[in-house]
UniProtKB/Swiss-Prot annotation:
Pathway: tRNA modification; 5-methoxycarbonylmethyl-2-thiouridine-tRNA biosynthesis. It comes from Schizosaccharomyces pombe (strain 972 / ATCC 24843) (Fission yeast). This is Ubiquitin-related modifier 1. The gene is urm1. One of its GO terms (molecular function) is protein tag activity. SUPFAM superfamilies: MoaD/ThiS (SSF54285). Pfam families: Urm1.
Length: 97
């Protein structure tokens, strides 16, 4: 079962400049959205930048998470069960100025 992940707002820089990924749910070990977040944190190109994506075991404040264009806060956050064909978008609102 495959899902699509998009990385916007500069998050692609943490993932070797990949703006979109196609992932198999079987690689995550669980269908929970929290498992996807853990997996994404593990594949960050530079481990020293992990805290730019994850903080205290979840997505850092300032990163919007959408599942099929719905805010994850409406979908049980980390407990949401991903399904075949889901599209998960991570959008960073964090930036310098």
């Amino acid at each position: 079962m495959a899902i699509k992940v998009e990385l916007l707002g500069g998050l692609d820089l943490l993932f070797n400049k990949q703006k979109a990924l196609s992932l198999s749910l079987s690689n995550l070990g669980s269908t929970k959205l929290g498992s996807l977040i853990d997996y994404m944190a593990q594949i960050i190109e530079k481990p020293s930048q992990k805290d730019l994506f994850i903080l205290n075991g979840t997505v850092r404040p300032g990163i919007i998470v959408l599942v099929n264009d719905q805010d994850w806060e409406l979908l049980e956050k980390e407990e949401y069960n991903l399904e075949e064909g889901d599209e998960v978008v991570f959008v960073s609102t964090l930036h310098g100025g």
